[in-house]
């Protein structure tokens, strides 16, 4: 099969990767911070880099036509059957286990769905979990991101006796119609038709 299109997340720093289109998602809630690069700030590229790509504002309240936000779906049980999903109780105590770059966003997501009784357990971005990281003194469930769930699933398969519930909060990127229109226009200019 011939590939017509490759989409790379976090591909801006992969300079060897040839590209024709660059979209830069700018979190309007965080802004540009102190405008310094890692490790002094949280930027991966200088601010000037914004002028080289298409900037998509990430905020539900954005006034830019090129915007997106994350829509939260119902949590699902990572280590159980699908019929157990109805057992999710947002009023119980949770351990929020998270290994992402900006864990506060996950905590805000939990609060946005009415979940406020959670204890934060943060790990570095792209963390490789050990089963000991999921051991706590009581039997309260864990709640985590889909990104972390991808790393936790193989670990759970290695430890089939692990019986603490792990709930996953899925989010879906919702792009404005202007984003889809621009993408169609940019791809058409490259001779790629996705319709």
State each model region's role:
Residues 1-67, 74:
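Phosphate/Mg2+-binding loops and adjacent switch elements
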Residues 28-31, 71-72, 122-128, 169-175:
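Short, acidic/turn-prone active-site loops that include or flank metal/cofactor-
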Residues 36-54, 58-69, 94, 106, ...:
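Ser/Thr/Gly-rich flexible loops in soluble cytosolic domains mediating phosphotransfer, phosphorylation
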Residues 74-80, 87-131, 181-189:
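Redox- and metal-dependent alpha/beta enzyme cores, enriched for Fe-S-associated oxidoreductases
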């Amino acid at each position: 099969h011939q590939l017509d299109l490759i989409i790379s997340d976090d591909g801006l720093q992969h300079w060897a990767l040839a590209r024709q289109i660059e979209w830069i998602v700018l979190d309007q809630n965080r802004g540009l911070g102190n405008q310094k690069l890692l490790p002094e700030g949280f930027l991966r590229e200088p601010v000037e880099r914004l002028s080289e790509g298409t900037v998509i504002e990430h905020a539900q309240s954005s006034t830019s036509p090129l915007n997106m936000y994350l829509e939260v779906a119902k949590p699902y049980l990572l280590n159980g059957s699908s019929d157990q999903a109805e057992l999710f109780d947002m009023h119980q105590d949770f351990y929020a286990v998270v290994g992402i770059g900006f864990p506060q966003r996950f905590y805000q997501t939990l609060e946005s769905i009415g979940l406020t009784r959670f204890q934060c357990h943060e790990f570095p971005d792209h963390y490789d979990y050990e089963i000991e990281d999921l051991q706590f003194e009581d039997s309260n469930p864990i709640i985590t991101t889909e990104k972390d769930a991808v790393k936790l699933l193989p670990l759970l398969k290695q430890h089939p006796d692990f019986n603490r519930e792990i709930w996953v909060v899925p989010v879906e990127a919702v792009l404005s119609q202007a984003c889809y229109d621009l993408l169609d226009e940019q791809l058409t200019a490259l001779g790629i038709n996705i319709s």
